[in-house]
Amino acid sequence: MPTPENLATDATVAIMLADGFEEVEALAVADVLYRAGVRADLISVTDARHVTSSHGIRVVADLMLEDVDLSAYTLLFLPGGMPGTLGLKATPAIQTEVLRRADAGQPVAAICAAPSILAELGVLEGRHATANPAFVKAIAAGGAIVHENPVVVDEFIITSRGAGTSLELGLEIVRYLLGAEVVDEVARGVVLAR
């Protein structure tokens, strides 16, 4: 994505895209971050910059996974969608980075089916989390304390339920990175009742 003209922070977000990603989840969060002045890069884990969503919409990623250092980003974001979540889960660099961040206490956000990746890696053990209702059993099996809230924050792990909670997830990431005042401003800008 282009760098926001109102760049408000040095914080950066890596938005990971595999074929079959959920476009509302990925792009609504990207939009909220842009409005808040946070640079977010759409990063393809496929062998091409064109990535196709779970509903057949083609998106051009900013960067290829092979060309970035994920550890240089402030926050790693895993959108859901099927089979996109499976594509992210099958990407060794994603697994490695999620585990590194968990060990270092660095932020990871995941929505819909993607929290199941965190659960399978053991990152949600004893942590409060949420996911799409179809994946609640998977995160519970991974030791998560499951909630039905739209967004759940447990220290540096941020999880959300699905496409309908994407704006709220984006705002929670903004809160994590920039604070509540910016959240209120962005929420007003997207006419989100709070």
What are these regions (language model features)?
Residues 112:
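Catalytic, metal-anchored helix/loop core of enzyme active sites in primary metabolism
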Residues 153:
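Cytochrome P450 catalytic-domain "roof"
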Residues 1-108, 116-120, 125-126, 138-148, ...:
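Extended, subdomain-level signal for the structured scaffold at the beginning of enzyme domains
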Residues 133-136:
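Short, acidic/turn-prone active-site loops that include or flank metal/cofactor-
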Residues 129:
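Anionic-ligand binding patches
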